[in-house]
A protein has these predicted regions:
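Adenosyl-5′-phosphate
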Residues: 1-189
Length: 189
């Protein structure tokens, strides 16, 4: 990704499939807007800022609102849980938005200011722990024939055949199972 504009590099972190792969998998693929078409206005909004700030602006306006917060809200409601997002409290957000990038992240560490503050009240080992979110072992499940069999069955239904080139879907699953390619994210989506 080196040498590409920031907008393309940033999208590359989350883009699951390039246009070529979409054409291979989908029978009637019609390209719509590219991810960079959606993110460009937010990079323009923060033009002149450092790369981290530009990516944060894009994430705040696209990914958080349209993806991660939406999913968290739906999943918590579906399970009768009340979810709190303390870092989105207005006062906390306003304070955090004034923290210089050099106090947020460097080549070796993320969340520098937050970890520094946390180390004053919790063990350093905990404050320095890697962020995990809620990892689900989908990669491993898709290499287990019991679960891969369920996916393969879905890949070979009349509904799947209507929209997808199922031979390509099955090849993608086979590559993942054999370890030739790590396709779990593309299969899962």
């Amino acid at each position: 990704r080196r040498g590409k504009p920031l907008e393309e590099r940033s999208i590359g972190n989350t883009n699951l499939m390039d246009e070529h792969r979409k054409k291979k998998l989908l029978k009637n693929y019609r390209p719509g807007k590219l991810p960079t078409d959606l993110s460009r206005p937010y990079f323009e909004l923060s033009k002149g800022q450092d790369a981290v700030t530009q990516m944060e602006t894009c994430d705040l306006n696209l990914w958080m609102v349209g993806d991660i917060l939406l999913k968290a809200d739906k999943m918590s409601m579906a399970n009768s849980l009340e979810l709190r997002v303390p870092f989105l409290d207005r006062k906390v957000f306003e304070l955090a938005s004034h923290i210089p990038t050099k106090c947020k992240v460097n080549a070796n560490q993320t969340k520098i200011a937050m970890r520094g503050a946390a180390e004053k009240t919790i063990p350093a080992k905990t404050a320095d722990k890697k962020k995990l979110g809620f990892p689900v072992p989908v990669r491993a499940w898709l290499r287990d024939e019991q679960y891969a069999g369920v996916v393969r069955k879905a890949f070979n239904t009349p509904a799947a055949e209507q929209f997808f080139r199922t031979k390509e879907l099955n090849a993608m699953l086979d590559q993942h199972i054999s370890g030739k390619r790590d396709n779990w994210r593309q299969i899962w989506c």
